[in-house]
Structure formats: structure tokens, C-alpha cells
Amino acid sequence: DDVLNILVYYHLNEFSSGRELLQNLEEDEYAKRLIAPVGGVKRSTFFDTVNERCVEQLLYVFCELQKQAASRLPARHVELGTLVAVDGSFIDSVLSMTWAEYQTQNNKAKLHLGFDLTHGIPKSIVLTEGNGAERPQVSSLVQPGETTVSDRGYQDHERFDKWHEEGRHFICRIKENTHMAVMEELPLAVNSPAYFDAKVILGVASGKQTKTPVRVVGFKFDGVSYLIATDRFDLTAEQVMLAYKLRWNIETFVRKHDQIG
């Protein structure tokens, strides 16, 4: 509990280093009375404990805060179901963190983030080495019944089938040159901003191809063309577009995180 309180205090006050934190715990009356354990904190003990348990403690704090926030914040766009945007971001690491392998002289960890678009807050996180692949983490970030919302880096036809079988829905932008075999063109609403809506098979038979038909919605925004693959046939084309546009919230969050870091 002492380590947990100190770590929360550290991040709330945005200390520049552990040494600055320890100095504050020794000199600040509030910190000495309510944060530091009785008898103070030994530097060597503190750093050893943090190196061994920091991630575990912070993950616990994150999970508890996420539960409380989700229960109090209003839910938006509930008609779309539970939407979870996924993305990855690098975190600088010291060379002694050998598990965070990235480059010979540059260790980085990778934060895989699931962002709850319904409540506008982070939902789930996974930490891997910097070279860790992003697509395999989706099954840890998104639960069955929820919908993954992702960019082109997560396009994987075999995983689309796997997620569908597991009950994990997906709304994923795909590359413009993706081969599509149209099985059925779906009707568009009058004056719809979408220019394409169809049930298709993605990929070619000689390569990686979806076994289960998916839906692809095409639209343009600010002069850029988007193709969105999904298994959500229950939504309108406009709702698929809205769900993908909401994904940009995670990019805003990640950019702010990188600026703070």
C-alpha cells in the first residue's frame, strides 16, 4: 500500500525523477504525514521495490480507476454497441530493461491500448517489448461482444475470421488496393455520404482470404478515401462511418500521452 500511494503521488505531481520524489517525501509536511510510511523511505529500498513491482502496481491502479470512471461517466453512442479503439505507442526504456528489446542501443517498450469510445477513456492495456506485434494483442484488449475499431495496421484477413468466430466484432480500415470479390451490393440511403456498401470476400484464393464474408463501406472525408471492413451488418453505413471517425479519439489521446511523456 505504501508503494502504491507513493506511485500515485508521483504521477499526480509529475515529479521529474525518483530522486525529486524522495526529496519531497522527506521535506514536504503533507507528504511526510500522509504519503510516506512511518520512518521514511530508504532510497535503495524504494528503487529496488519500484524496479520489481512498479508495472504490477500501476496496472492495478489503472484497472481500479477505469472501473470507477466507466461507472460514473455517461455512455455515448450506445446504439453502436461497445466500441474499443486499439492502437500501439512506444515508451522509452533504459538499456537495463532487457525485456524491452527494440534496437541495439535503444530499448523501448510498447504500450498496446484499448480505448473505450463509449465513455471516452482508456479501457485496457498490454505492455510488450518494443518489437512486439500489435495484432495479436487485440484478443487481450477487446472482449467477446465488443467491437474493435482500428486502422490499416490491424488489417489481417485470418484474424478477421478468428475474431468473428470468437464473437469479437471489428470495424477496421483496409488498404485501398485490397482485392475484394463482391457477393452482394447493399442499398445506400438517399444522400448517404458513403459511396460503397457491399458484402465481400477479402483477398485472393491463392493468398490470405477471408473465409467468412465481411462488409465493406467506402466513403470520402477531407478528400481522402476510406474503405472500412466490418462484420457489423446490423449497422447502417452511416453508423459504420461514425464508429470509425470516433476512433480518432484514441489518436488524440496517444498524442497527448506522448507530449506529456
Model-derived regions, located:
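Single, function-defining residue in the core of a domain
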Residues: 1-18, 24, 51-53, 60-61, ...
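Short Lys/Arg-enriched helix C-cap and helix-to-coil transition segments
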Residues: 57-69
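DNA-recognition alpha helix
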Residues: 17-35
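Short hydrophobic/aromatic segments of transmembrane alpha-helices and their interfaces
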Residues: 29, 74, 237-238
